[in-house]
Each structure stands twice: as structure tokens, then as C-alpha cells.
Amino acid sequence: MEIIIAFFLYLNDKRKKRFLFKKSKIPLMIITNNDIVMCPIWYNYQVNTVFLPCAHVACYLCSKIIKNCHLCRRKILKTQFFKLP
């Protein structure tokens, strides 16, 4: 059984217009029952926090420590907790 989790980003007006034309570009994370997605920073904990506006993920502990995204280096404006089944 596959579970699809879509992260909807807060987008500024310019990005919203681009987004409407490219609906197929919604960032998706496809997770199967056998997958365990580990934190890309520590590799000790399962991911459960998404950074906004970039939508990259990490574990809760890492999300509390870092101010800029570890992948794209964008400033983290907000974090959103999520729970994988």
C-alpha cells in the first residue's frame, strides 16, 4: 500500500502564478510501508518536520537547531510537524 503525502507550500504571488500552470510539479514524497525515511542530517531519527518555504525535511531535533535549510541554504521561515503512519 502506498501513501502519498503532498506538501503544500506557502508561495508568494509570483510563485502562485507559476504553480497554477505547473500543477504536476507539486512536491510529493511517496512512502511505502517498507520505507523508513531517516533524517538526512543525523541519520538517527525518522523525518517528521518539513521546512517552509523550501519543503525539505528533517527530524524534530534538527529542525529546532538549524536556522537555514541544510540542502538549499534558504532561511527557514516556518516548520510544520507531520507524522508518518
UniProtKB/Swiss-Prot annotation:
InterPro entries: Znf_RING/FYVE/PHD. GO terms for molecular function: zinc ion binding. Keywords: Metal-binding, Zinc, Zinc-finger. A zinc finger (RING-type) spans 39-73. It holds the Pfam family zf-C3HC4_3. This is Putative RING finger protein 095L. It comes from Invertebrate iridescent virus 6.
